Amino acid sequence: METNHRYPVNQLDWLLDDLVMRVPHITRAVFLSQDGLALGASRGMDQAATDHLAALASAFQSLARSASSTFGGDARQSIIEMTTGFFIVSAAGQGTCLAVLTTSDADIGQVAYEMAILVQRTGDHLQVNMRTRSALFLTR
């Protein structure tokens, strides 16, 4: 069994690999629980990189949820523009998020669209109870 970080390859990994391979300029992708536990990662990410990206995405999404509860509405997607690219986090399912890193050449509209499609495909099937990795269920 191939591993690209501390967890064995699972059903989420191949979806993330597909996203990275299909969408130009996406370099990394991670599914995570809202409390920062990595649930799946694209190829090429070691344990430290996966855990770091998941922790950053969790903190970023927490800020977005706080802002949206203060100002109204739900936090759907948050974007940080850096000189080297973009960091994008989207709510994915109950208690989960999708985070991607891109290069600066990325078409953010296309990336956001592809993330939304992936979230639509998986969001209803992802259920995570906080503080436990074993709480991930993929239902049919």
Give a label for each model feature.
Residues M1-R28, D35-R140:
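Acidic, low-complexity cytosolic segments
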